[in-house]
């Protein structure tokens, strides 16, 4: 009989998983409610935990709080850090905001090629603002920046093993305009 107590119980495992998932969901809901009430400090505290657990939406939201100085001291460096994490997880709004930070030299050295790269990733996911920003940046880029942007895309595609036939970056395909 003692051996039976040591066997895993599927119902207990499912209950534990549901509890774990509902805890994360509850924290996200608490963060959203706090933000909507204007309690940005509480939202930041709730988001911090989720962001550290790898939640891309929470990373973006926390980056936005640092970017705007709501509930936390305004910090370009912290905003950049959280946007970068979320962008690396594929969050299109973070990719767009990260691109803007590179375009404007906000918390990072101004770099049109990096800016173009990040807004292109966001545009590929349907972000209309990113599409406009990508087109605007393209007009400002030098041939050297175009070459660097192509290299960023190649490296990214190699690292992520993306299909190079996608519309990720028109520059990679040698098109003259986005």
Positions of PLM-derived features:
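N-terminal secretory signal peptides that target proteins for export/translocation
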Residues: 1-8
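Bacterial N-terminal signal peptides
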Residues: 10-22
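N-terminal leader/linker segments that initiate helical-solenoid repeat arrays
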Residues: 21-46, 178
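Hydrophobic face of amphipathic alpha-helices that form TPR/SEL1-like repeat modules
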Residues: 29-34, 49-50, 61-68, 97-104, ...
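Short helix-capping/linker turns of helical repeat alpha-solenoids
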Residues: 34-39, 48, 52-55, 68-70, ...
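Alpha-solenoid helical repeat scaffolds
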Residues: 60-61, 93-100, 112, 117, ...
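Terminal, low-structured helical/coil segments at or just beyond the last alpha-helical repeat
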Residues: 130-178
């Amino acid at each position: 009989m003692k051996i039976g107590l040591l066997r895993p119980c599927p119902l207990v495992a499912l209950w534990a998983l549901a509890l774990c998932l509902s805890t994360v969901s509850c924290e996200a809901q608490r963060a959203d409610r706090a933000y909507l009430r204007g309690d940005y400090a509480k939202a930041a505290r709730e988001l911090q935990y989720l962001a550290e657990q790898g939640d891309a939406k929470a990373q973006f939201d926390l980056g936005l709080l640092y970017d705007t100085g709501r509930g936390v001291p305004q910090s370009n460096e912290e905003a950049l850090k959280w946007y970068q994490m979320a962008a690396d997880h594929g969050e299109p709004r973070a990719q767009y905001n990260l691109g803007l930070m590179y375009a404007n030299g906000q918390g990072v050295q101004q770099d049109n090629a990096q800016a173009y790269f990040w807004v292109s990733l966001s545009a590929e996911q349907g972000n209309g603002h990113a599409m406009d920003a990508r087109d605007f940046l393209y007009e400002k880029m030098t041939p050297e920046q175009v070459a660097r942007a192509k290299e960023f895309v190649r490296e990214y595609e190699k690292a992520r093993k993306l299909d190079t036939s996608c519309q990720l970056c028109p520059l990679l395909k040698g098109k003259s305009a986005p």
